[in-house]
Each structure stands twice: as structure tokens, then as C-alpha cells.
Amino acid sequence: MIHWEQSRTLLSFPQVGLHLSWYGIFFSLGIFLSSFAGIRLATVLCKDPNMRKELKTGLENFALGALLVIVIGARAFYVLFYGGSFYFENPSEIIKIWKGGLSSHGAIIALVIWSAAFSRFHIRRLPMLSVTYICDICGAVFGVAALLIRVGNFMNQEILGTPTSMPWGVVFANDSSLIARHPVQLYEGVSYLLLSLVLYWLCYRGSIRLGSGYSAAGALIGVASIRFCAEFFKTHQGSWLGEESLLTIGQWLSIPMVFLGIGILWIASKKREP
């Protein structure tokens, strides 16, 4: 059994009212490292040396916009699906993301939309920047960000797991029940990282071609499946569905992602047919 009493705040500057949380640091670091890995993967695999610099610049611009878009999408989904009536009664609280409340499903949807928009405005200059190309890169490198974000959740003592008698059960100081719980944040984060590493390796060695859609489809199906299973080890979240509901909000939101991934796989397979 592990007793976890880590403060949610990494650095505090009360003189200026600034408090840096573990979650915020890990979130930012994760996005940066995943972006770096994605740009590196794309430039290494680019066969035209004259295009590498321009491709690198384009993907750097994509990554900068993605950071903002991910936060907006993740917050919007949290407010809609997990906030219940609270945010409708207190709309000024919606912008206070430093208090917590981001949804990974919203982040994924926002990233796909941003990929489509970015591709539309840049594909004439860089024809390789198709929606599937960008999404394939994201699918191959998302794991670092996903892991660090879940580590941030663990450090913040949020998204608690169900009770367990296993020796690695964690007693969180902020949990009033003070009972050992599954460190489900780490289960989920490590699973995402392993999935992403497999996809990255397949892309790097050429088994999956960037732009084919296979990496994006694999990531969507894999992430949704991992999330669906992880929900069984989480305490109840959200207020739209009661604890007696057959599935959680997270599981319901994961189901369309599986079908979307299957649809992309089907389209990709049709393109390969002679």
C-alpha cells in the first residue's frame, strides 16, 4: 500500500498570485515532447531533402495552434459532459481551467478538426500535409503527452480509482475515505504510451506509411478501447449519468471513436486495393 500526500502545487508565487500545478507542467511538457517527436518522425521519413525544412516549419506551426485548440476542445467537452448544471448556472467558471476539468475526448475531436483546418490552408504549398498525414503523425506520438497528462492527474490526486487490496493500491491524502485505490491514472497513461510506441515503431520502419490513415485509425481504436476498459477501475465521474448507469460518460464517448477508427481503416483498405 502506498500513501500519497504530494501537494497539487509544484511552484507557488503568492506575491503575484501565481501557482503552477503538477498537472499544468506535465500537460505542457507532454504536448511539447509529443510535438517534437512528431516533427522528428515526419522530417526523418521525408524523402525529399528540399522539403524537410518547409515541412518542419509547417508542423511547428501546427503544433503551436494545436496546444490552444486542444485546451479549448478538452474544456468544452468537460463542461458539456461532466460539468452537469454547474457551468450553466455559473458561466464565469468555464474559463477557469486552472481549477481543473479537461476531457481527453474533447481534445481528440478538437485535434482532428484542427488537422482538417490546417491541412485545408496549407496543402497547396505542402501537398503532403493531408488530414490523414497529420493525424497519422499525431497517432504515432500522442503517447508521451497522454502518459504525462495522466501522471499529472495522479500528482493532483484526481480521477481516482476504485478500492483495491492489491499491494500497489494508493491511499490519496485528498480522499476523505482514506482507502487504497487502483492507480488507474497510471494504468491508463502507461497503456497509451505502449500503444503509441508500437504505432511510432511501425511508422518509423515503414510498415505504416504516413498519410495512409492506419496510424490514426489504430490510435483511435486503441485509445477508445483503453479508455473503455480503464473506466471500470474509476470512481464515478460527471453528473449527467448516475452511478447505476450501465456505462459511464467516458465509455459512451469512447464508442463513437471506435467506429470512427474502423471507418478510417475501411477507407484506407479500399485505397490500397488495385
Swiss-Prot record:
Record localization: Cell inner membrane
* Cellular component terms per the entry's GO annotation: plasma membrane
EC id: 2.5.1.145
PROSITE patterns, alphabetized = LGT
Q: Does the record carry Amino-acid biosynthesis as a key word?
A: no
EC class, as a word, reads transferase
Q: Which UniProt keywords apply?
A: Cell inner membrane, Cell membrane, Membrane, Transferase, Transmembrane, Transmembrane helix
TM spans, by residue? Answer: 16-36, 62-82, 94-114, 129-149, 184-204, 213-233, 247-267
This protein's membrane topology, according to the annotation, is: Multi-pass membrane protein
Free-text function comment from the UniProt entry: Catalyzes the transfer of the diacylglyceryl group from phosphatidylglycerol to the sulfhydryl group of the N-terminal cysteine of a prolipoprotein, the first step in the formation of mature lipoproteins.
PANTHER family membership: PHOSPHATIDYLGLYCEROL--PROLIPOPROTEIN DIACYLGLYCERYL TRANSFERASE, PROLIPOPROTEIN DIACYLGLYCERYL TRANSFERASE
The name this protein goes by in its record: Phosphatidylglycerol--prolipoprotein diacylglyceryl transferase
Query: Lineage, please?
Result: Bacteria, Pseudomonadati, Chlamydiota, Chlamydiia, Chlamydiales
